[in-house]
Amino acid sequence: MAETNPELSDLMAQTNKKIVPKFTEIFPVEDVNYPYSAFIASVRKDVIKHCTDHKGIFQPVLPPEKKVPELWFYTELKTRTSSITLAIRMDNLYLVGFRTPGGVWWELARPATPTSSATTPGGSASAAGTRTSSATRVWRPSPWAARDDQGRQRPGEEEEDGDTGGGGGADADADAGGAELAAAAAAADPQADTKSKLVKLVVMVCEGLRFNTLSRTVDAGFNSQHGVTLTVTQGKQVQKWDRISKAAFEWADHPTAVIPDMQKLGIKDKNEAARIVALVKNQTTAAAAAATAASADNDDDEA
């Protein structure tokens, strides 16, 4: 029986619509004069150009989410011998695809829906921006593997099948997406310290953009042989970025509101939230959808 064609992934959809990244930020990981902190600050600055100010919220607010995102950016992590490119949605800072040193795009296939990335409290961070249930999460080679950023086939390049050289296939389980990224990073450079830096960057870039506290932690431990370890509180905050963003909108309307969920995260008010979180996820789309649903329910009751 012929296999049903899957729904277009975000990467394929943006290419079909001729949507190109708004910018590409290159990070030469071996350049001691361009530290991780400078890289994250530069990417944030470019993202903020597409953000909006919201009355009562201190942080820039990301663009509203769309089913097929139209705002993207790439970050290219380079060594002297190779590079890895990450495709990141600007409306929610989710990592949904990456290009290996061999030029193969791997993407998070639908129907998986990316949510906030997960970090084990007190442990090292896991795959950034791509947390979904093990039943739905699938990494697969993109059919657009050998195309450039404008969707054109690169001369002389063939699209690849199979894995990234890390021993894992396309149908990865909940943890294998991060393993594929790590394998790609390891292939980029044989030097152990550079491999470590690449893996940490691949894991941390999305959360590093979202969180002031996390990016400072990563920067402080960037050259550590032991990797970067988050506190229990930091891990919980990373898991609740969506909820912290929602709280920022609540505080905008009710500045003195006591929000129990935030107190559990060690965030007592909007000032504390602004110290911890650098960029807020837009809640206006969700609010509009909720209002529409409520209106429909009222209409049904009146009918």
Curated annotation (Swiss-Prot):
EC number of the protein: 3.2.2.22
Keyword Ribonucleoprotein found: no
GO MF annotation: an example: toxin activity
Cellular compartments annotated: Cytoplasm
Record bears the keyword Transferase: no
Basic and acidic residues bias: start-end ranges: 146-156
Xref: Pfam families: RIP (PF00161)
Tissue-specificity statement: Endosperm.
Cystine pairs: none
One Gene Ontology CC term in the entry: cytoplasm
Ranges for region Disordered: 112-175
Record's protein name: Albumin b-32
Species this protein is from: Zea mays (Maize)
